[in-house]
Regions:
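Glycine-rich N-terminal segment of FAD-binding domains in flavoprotein oxidoreductases
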Residues: 2-66, 74, 80-82
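Short glycine/serine-rich loop/turn segments
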Residues: 5-9, 49-58, 93, 99, ...
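Short coil/turn connectors at secondary-structure junctions
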Residues: 10-12, 34-37, 54-57, 65-66, ...
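General beta-strand structural signal in soluble alpha/beta enzymes
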Residues: 17, 39-43, 60, 70-71, ...
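Structural signature of FAD isoalloxazine-binding scaffolds in flavoprotein oxidoreductases
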Residues: 17, 49-66, 122-141, 169-172
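Short, structural beta-strand-to-alpha-helix junction motif
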Residues: 20, 76-77, 84-91, 107-110
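Short active-site loop/helix that positions an aromatic residue
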Residues: 27, 89-95
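C-terminal cap/substrate-recognition region of VAO/PCMH-type FAD-linked oxidoreductases
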Residues: 99, 136-221
Length: 221
């Protein structure tokens, strides 16, 4: 059984765990030769859609392609494997005084979040994760390998920043990290009687706060 997110799970017939790009190409070839098999691509398994798993099909688990590498210290350019978890990225960048905006939970995989947007606690000041994406390497459905950036395959680069799951399998990404010093975090609880009034007040506070402050709201019964 392969869990997809907090609510979904699946029982795929076959799970492949590539360790390099060549094995990803081979896996794509297998999927192409067996079109009757549903295909899921799994980085961390937290996608809300649940498409990273299935029942009876093929799941390509990218978890072993989890490298975190500083490419260029001066420009803070970092290369990440799609299977890396954001907690590991944060731990690797912390000694440099850097961070990448990466959602709100460390167990999320790089591949899914970085191709879908990436809204997190640093977003108001440093932008979405895709705003800092500089390049992505992909394996396409025909097994070919391409690199997408503003200079190479710019139309693919435009699309991979938000719709990457529709284009191919990302095998690595290059992202510019941001210099981040001390970070403050607080979680507050409120007993709310007038929900409409509270939401209006929260909206005013969130939008008027300094850009260094990001506010999230979770409501429950």
């Amino acid at each position: 059984r392969v869990r997809s997110n907090y609510m979904r799970g699946g029982n795929p017939g076959l799970v492949l765990r590539p360790e390099n790009v060549r094995q990803v190409v081979d896996a794509v070839g297998y999927a192409r030769r067996n079109p009757h098999l549903e295909l899921g691509i799994r980085s961390g398994g937290h996608g809300i859609s649940g498409r990273s798993t299935n029942n009876g099909g093929l799941v390509l688990d990218m978890g072993r392609m989890n490298a975190v590498e500083v490419v260029d210290e001066a420009s803070r350019l970092v290369r990440l494997g799609p299977g890396a978890r954001w907690r590991d990225v944060a731990s690797a960048l912390q000694p440099h005084g850097w961070a990448i905006g990466s959602g709100d939970y460390g167990g999320v995989g790089v591949g899914g979040l970085v191709t879908a947007g990436g809204l997190g606690f640093l977003s108001r000041h440093h932008g979405l994760t895709i705003d800092n994406l500089r390049a992505a390497d992909l394996v396409l459905a025909d097994g070919s390998q391409i690199r997408a950036s503003e200079e190479e395959n710019p139309e693919v680069f435009w699309a991979v920043r938000g719709a990457g799951a529709n284009l191919g399998i990302v095998t690595s990404v290059e992202i510019t990290a941001s210099p981040v010093d001390q970070v403050g975090w607080a979680q507050l609880g409120f007993a709310v009687r007038d929900v409409a009034e509270f939401l209006e007040a929260f909206g005013q506070v969130a939008t008027s706060a300094p850009r260094q402050t990001t506010a999230f709201l979770i409501m429950g019964p």
